[in-house]
Amino acid sequence: MARYIGPKAKLSRREGTDLFLKSARRSLADKCKLDSKPGQHGRTSGARTSDYGTQLREKQKVKRIYGVLERQFRRYFAEADRLKGNTGENLLQLLESRLDNVVYRMGFGSTRAEARQLVSHKAIMVNGVVSNIPSMQVKAGDVVAVREQKKKQARILEALSLAEQGGLPSWVAVDSKKFEGTFKQKPERSDIAGDINESLIVELYSR
């Protein structure tokens, strides 16, 4: 599947917020001006953004946060709409339950892109079985672990250290000494970044 491989900071500048595409080793605010759009002097426009434009920007932002392309994102939305409950919250839970995201949330990867690479390179096991499918849906009670021969990788050790300093989500339990974690449950909406407005995405796809 094709993926964006250009400058990650540029995407965050485009959205005007940190999308957490880069490692927390250094604050993104120190690397670039998030309140300035990409371009030599930052693109400016006096035109008011339409409702459609606002909805589209929110969808693009969420796609970039989770590293998902349009076709797959549409499938997630269709599944979220089919499930009982709030469609927007269902969508975020599906995205948060992706294996690459869970690996990132457990602190084995410093970014979602790094976590996706660990999965693709068969460094991760789910319930004792190697999985190289980043989009795999992790279920409550599943145990996600780093393979024995990969535990000494410097990037994994550094990512775990950073994650422990920053704090781990309440919906995962991690044993850093064993390099494994348990997916306790799907996160509640309050557990997910508050700067995402999923209702705008629902409005966009409901047009």
Curated annotation (Swiss-Prot):
Keyword presence, Ribosomal protein: yes
SUPFAM superfamilies named among the record's database cross-references: Alpha-L RNA-binding motif
Molecular function GO terms recorded: rRNA binding; structural constituent of ribosome
SMART domains according to UniProt: Ribosomal_S4, S4
Record's keyword annotation contains Ribonucleoprotein: yes
Gene3D superfamilies, per database record: Ribosomal Protein S4 Delta 41, Chain A, domain 1, RNA-binding S4 domain
A GO term from the CC aspect: small ribosomal subunit
Polar residues: bias regions: 42-53
UniProt keywords, alphabetically: Ribonucleoprotein, Ribosomal protein, RNA-binding, rRNA-binding
Pfam families xrefs: Ribosomal_S4, S4
Family named by the database record: Belongs to the universal ribosomal protein uS4 family.
Biological role: One of the primary rRNA binding proteins, it binds directly to 16S rRNA where it nucleates assembly of the body of the 30S subunit. With S5 and S12 plays an important role in translational accuracy.
Subunit structure: Part of the 30S ribosomal subunit. Contacts protein S5. The interaction surface between S4 and S5 is involved in control of translational fidelity.
Protein name: Small ribosomal subunit protein uS4
Species of origin: Paraburkholderia xenovorans (strain LB400)
Native organism taxonomy: Bacteria, Pseudomonadati, Pseudomonadota, Betaproteobacteria, Burkholderiales
